[in-house]
A protein has these predicted regions:
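Residue-level recognition of conserved beta-strand positions in structured domain cores
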Residues: 59, 71, 87-89, 113, ...
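A short hydrophobic beta-strand segment most commonly corresponding to one strand
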Residues: 102, 109, 115-125
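Short acidic-glycine-tyrosine-enriched beta hairpin
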Residues: 89-106
Length: 125
């Protein structure tokens, strides 16, 4: 399924997230101001987008390093890798394979990625 025309994805589908080759993931440039340390690289693939663009489902991957972000409403499951996610004014989340996480819109986070992390996500705006 092509990310350039992900709107044609069926409402119900399955994908083996660990088996999607890195070559099928698209570069997602980080704002240099988000990088705290290291040289992290972000890639991903949108598998489905709602017609109004307010919901996305896909795969996201980041290599080791430390980055900051302001989150959307998101549910994700870590497929591989490890990271520590510090939520400003909130919890510190240690995540690894099988971790299911919820982030709220507006959460300010710092991601310390220890091992290249891949997740399957659902985001709503």
């Amino acid at each position: 399924m092509s990310t350039s025309d992900h709107s044609v994805a069926p409402a119900s589908f399955a994908v083996s997230v660990p088996d999607v080759p890195d070559a099928e993931l698209e570069a997602d440039d980080l704002d240099p101001d988000q990088i705290v340390s290291g040289d992290p690289v972000v890639t991903g693939k949108v598998l489905w987008e709602s017609p109004d663009g307010k919901q996305l489902r896909g795969i996201w991957q980041i290599t080791p390093g430390v980055v900051t972000d302001v989150e959307a409403n998101e549910l994700f499951v870590v497929v591989s890798g490890r990271a520590t996610i510090e939520v400003e004014g909130g919890a510190t989340l240690e995540v690894g394979p099988g971790s299911a996480c919820v982030l709220r819109e507006g959460d300010k986070t710092t991601w310390t990625v220890h091992e290249t992390l891949r997740k399957a996500y659902h985001i709503s705006y």
